[in-house]
Amino acid sequence: MMKFKLVSDYRPLGDQPKAIRSLVNGIKAGMREQTLLGVTGSGKTFTVANVIAEVQKPTLVISHNKTLAAQLYEEFREFFPENAVEYFVSYYDFYQPEAYIPQTDTYIDKEASINDEIDRMRHSATQSLLSRDDVIVVSSVSCIYGIGAPTDYGEFTLHLEVGSGPGREEVLEGLINMQYERNDVEFDRGQFRVRGDTVEINPIHGTPPIRIEFFGDEIDSISTVHRVTGRRIQKLDRVTIFPAKHFVIPEDRLQRAIESIEAELEERLTELRSQNKLLEAQRLEQRTRFDMEMLREMGYCQGIENYSMHLSGRKWGEKPNTLLDYFPEDFLTVIDESHVTVPQIRGMYNGDRARKDTLVEYGFRLPSARENRPLRFDEFQESVNQVIYVSATPGRYELSRSQNIVEQIIRPTGLVDPEVRIRPVKGQVDDLLSEIRRRVERGERVLVTTLTKRMAEDLTDYYSRVGVKVRYLHSEIDTLERVEIIDDLRRGEFDCLVGVNLLREGLDLPEVALVAILDADKEGFLRSETSLIQTIGRAARNVNGEVLIYAGRFTDSVMAAVETTNRRRKLQMEYNRRHGIKPRSTRRTLREEEGPLRNLKVDEIPDHELELIIKDLEAEMRDAARNLEFERAARIRDRIMSLKSN
């Protein structure tokens, strides 16, 4: 059994040792739910890593979006380089679900673009869970959506060993049943090729291709090879091949599923005709019978997931198989930013159900299509074992259910929560302008959060006209461009960033010394106690951090947020005084572009060389994206676009 081994140059400091000890004791005592209430910059991820290393349990870490999940994945990979740290998020680059709009009689077919690299990582996650114990999977809410049953996935696994069977024909049949494709020309992931008594397999999880050489009905040798040159890399005694798809179905169950679909179809057609819904009945019969024919002939059809209840042999209302079923019973779940992630998990089922109800009502799908769904919240609760909620502002749900609430208020850096000043709304724009100019003179950065997109645009325009280097961040900017804007702020290419909701990922910036919250007296989602505390935390990584709250009256949310911040600040300052700690700003490396990217002079490069450079850069960009280095990938992408335009 492999053990988790934490590798780090740091040791627990501040409140971390106490938090680690308390959480570990809670897990060992059998506590089902605990909360780590850690302020911004207190090293919550490092605390969780230490807990995992102490309790030695396979762990699922759930984040509320792909970008945050990618950041956590990178951090855990650094902490556990010798263990299996995996990434499991939706593999769609683009996804338009099937839908019907009755008001306009508009049917929208499902459209999707699958990211091959993320698909590889999903398979790597499930394979690690079925083959070893030292596994951490960082996931989005994709973990509550249906995938194939682990029993089927494991049953279709092919175990091969030198000096024994199965023979060549059995191996080929097994690969076909596992949804591998034969392709003797190309050799992509999830494909195999045959050359005489030699079979080469390119595994779905992306490890080097495997060459199997047969002598009669025995395996003579197994080795990994280079995909292009075919050169042998390493000889192996044995190897395990996992299925190319998460949905793999035995032939006998497929036939039973088709019969079950037929029975449901007849029942539903009778019901629709009795209600005089003849158009809906005709539509349903035509679509379903076509799908059934495809299943008989090909073993697959478009939208096969809508028949998942029949194909998996589940009963009506029975819980679908998800990533959680691939974990052993005694696993640990960590829900990051739980104040956002828990409501997201809770809401997935209802949103999916509403869309499916319309498709069923108008004859586009059988009623059983509703069973292709994410977990209900109660099913999710039953599926997890022990849970740690992690947040600077945990919600009522987490706090009410936790048997142990652990505060992590003291930061390892000695930084204290920023000083909060409340100022009147009248004249807020000009008052803030003078404060911004003071910070710019000191080489510091400023974040400003407004209530509306229009106000953010107008404020940016006004400050720009009076000489402030200011940019505006809005929801329509994609992830890579967002990373670039934040990097430009850190480099000092501009000094002030204005936005509506600056709580999202990637805004823990050591250079930011002032956060301004305009119109804080307007109660609502963006000015709730939780949102205000999160926004105040954006200034908590700089030793000169300060927050200005502009409010015409003291709302309950403002008072609670200020009171919480002042309480924490007092505790932190007292701790520093007792231990003689001098606070220091956090450090976060800003990745610079590589020299060759920055120094290329397009006019001096011959066309044929320019084409080669662009090809090299495109390969480098794909590598960066594959390694989840989004900042670097974005910079390379922009350089490619610049070269192409010239």
From Swiss-Prot:
Question: Which Pfam families would you find in this protein's record?
Answer: Helicase_C, ResIII, UVR, UvrB, UvrB_inter
What InterPro entries does the annotation carry? Helicase/UvrB_N (IPR006935), Helicase_ATP-bd (IPR014001), Helicase_C-like (IPR001650), P-loop_NTPase (IPR027417), UVR_dom (IPR001943), UVR_dom_sf (IPR036876), UvrB (IPR004807), UvrB_inter (IPR041471)
Which residues hold ATP?
G38, V39, T40, G41, S42, G43, K44, T45
Q: Where in the cell is it found?
A: Cytoplasm
Q: Which residues form the Helicase ATP-binding domain?
A: 25-412
> Motif (Beta-hairpin) spans which residues?
91-114
Question: One of this protein's GO BP terms?
Answer: nucleotide-excision repair
Q: Name one GO cellular component term.
A: cytoplasm
List UniProt keywords, sorted A-Z: ATP-binding, Cytoplasm, DNA damage, DNA excision, DNA repair, Excision nuclease, Nucleotide-binding, SOS response
What GO molecular functions are on record for this protein?
A: ATP binding; ATP hydrolysis activity; DNA binding; excinuclease ABC activity
Q: Where is the Helicase C-terminal domain?
A: 428-594
Which residues does the UniProt record annotate as the domain UVR? 611-646
The text of the family note is:
Belongs to the UvrB family.
Its assembly, as annotated, is:
Forms a heterotetramer with UvrA during the search for lesions. Interacts with UvrC in an incision complex.
UniProt function note: The UvrABC repair system catalyzes the recognition and processing of DNA lesions. A damage recognition complex composed of 2 UvrA and 2 UvrB subunits scans DNA for abnormalities. Upon binding of the UvrA(2)B(2) complex to a putative damaged site, the DNA wraps around one UvrB monomer. DNA wrap is dependent on ATP binding by UvrB and probably causes local melting of the DNA helix, facilitating insertion of UvrB beta-hairpin between the DNA strands. Then UvrB probes one DNA strand for the presence of a lesion.
Domain text? The beta-hairpin motif is involved in DNA binding.
User: What is the recorded name of this protein?
Assistant: UvrABC system protein B
Q: Which organism is it from?
A: Methanothermobacter thermautotrophicus (strain ATCC 29096 / DSM 1053 / JCM 10044 / NBRC 100330 / Delta H)
List the gene name: uvrB
